Amino acid sequence: MSGDEMIFDPTMSKKKKKKKKPFMLDEEGDTQTEETQPSETKEVEPEPTEDKDLEADEEDTRKKDASDDLDDLNFFNQKKKKKKTKKIFDIDEAEEGVKDLKIESDVQEPTEPEDDLDIMLGNKKKKKKNVKFPDEDEILEKDEALEDEDNKKDDGISFSNQTGPAWAGSERDYTYEELLNRVFNIMREKNPDMVAGEKRKFVMKPPQVVRVGTKKTSFVNFTDICKLLHRQPKHLLAFLLAELGTSGSIDGNNQLVIKGRFQQKQIENVLRRYIKEYVTCHTCRSPDTILQKDTRLYFLQCETCHSRCSVASIKTGFQAVTGKRAQLRAKAN
């Protein structure tokens, strides 16, 4: 309460607490209080210090109100948040800082950037990619293409359908360069001693391969190639089947039917190996040779340089015997 609200009343008197009246036991056992005891009652006189007491009460209330106001102010001040000072961003200073960083990064080489990236970014989940496995035909084509490049560098064997001059079978006139090439080719054929240092080229017809169904392949011009090479069909057939690792036979149309799916490039590679080993001479690389058998060995005799050398025998590769095993199991059961 403030001092304005207090009104001075002279009739008011301060209330005093009542004193407890103890009781005493007489010799006879009766209880006696102060009222029963013979004592003189004292009259309450009004104290002259009532004004002082009222002033003290007013001061106490004023102090309490002031302390309450201070507590409220402190409470509100604690709740108020301090405003952060806004920093002014200068574009020019930022550009200069970026340039300095770039110069420092160019001078200093990065050390182990992969580990830092892993720490910063964390382990990210990698997306699963659908892996497509290539077909057997595509794998074989790639392998055979690499083998062709290697063999063409070493061997002078090539396959082409042209048997005569380039202008044969057409109405166009021949050129001067074509005539020169023809003259030099004739000279080399007639006089092989003139071209001792040069490599000779052996030109062959390409094999004609046709699919028969889904599991067989037909070698159409098999007999024609045997005649061009001056070799027996049995010898060439044994080499083809051993290198390809399959089985096959010659049908009524003189075509070789092979079990399995094969492409023209694969058979060309096998023929190139056969020509290099059993047709061309090992000394002069001439195709004019004769294959002779003497005491279980094959000898290659050249008609141009008259050299004679032995040739490796044909060995069959690994072949699975699933059919025989199946028959043996069936008999055992």
Curated annotation (Swiss-Prot):
The keyword Metal-binding applies. The modification Phosphothreonine is found at T31, T36, T111. Keywords: Acetylation, Cytoplasm, Host-virus interaction, Initiation factor, Isopeptide bond, Metal-binding, Phosphoprotein, Protein biosynthesis, Ubl conjugation, Zinc, Zinc-finger. There is a cross-link at K102 (Glycyl lysine isopeptide (Lys-Gly) (interchain with G-Cter in SUMO2)). The modification N6-acetyllysine is found at K265, K293. The keyword DNA damage does not apply. Belongs to the eIF-2-beta/eIF-5 family. GO terms for molecular function: mRNA binding; RNA binding; translation factor activity, RNA binding; translation initiation factor activity; translation initiation factor binding; zinc ion binding. InterPro entries: IF2/IF5, Transl_init_fac_IF2/IF5_dom, Transl_init_fac_IF2/IF5_N, Transl_init_fac_IF2/IF5_Zn-bd. A zinc finger (C4-type) spans 281-305. It is found in: Cytoplasm, Cytosol. Residues 40-51, 96-105 have a biased composition (Basic and acidic residues). It comes from Homo sapiens. This is Eukaryotic translation initiation factor 2 subunit 2. Eukaryotic translation initiation factor 2 eIF2 is a heterotrimeric complex composed of an alpha (EIF2S1), a beta (EIF2S2) and a gamma (EIF2S3) chain. eIF2 is member of the 43S pre-initiation complex (43S PIC). eIF2 forms a complex with at least CELF1/CUGBP1, CALR, CALR3, EIF2S1, EIF2S2, HSP90B1 and HSPA5. EIF2S2 interacts with BZW2/5MP1. EIF2S2 interacts with EIF5. Interacts with CDC123. Interacts with methionyl-initiator methionine tRNA. (Microbial infection) Interacts with Aichi virus (AiV) leader protein. Residues 13-22 have a biased composition (Basic residues). The modification Phosphoserine is found at S2, S13, S67, S105, S158, S218. One of its GO terms (biological process) is translational initiation.
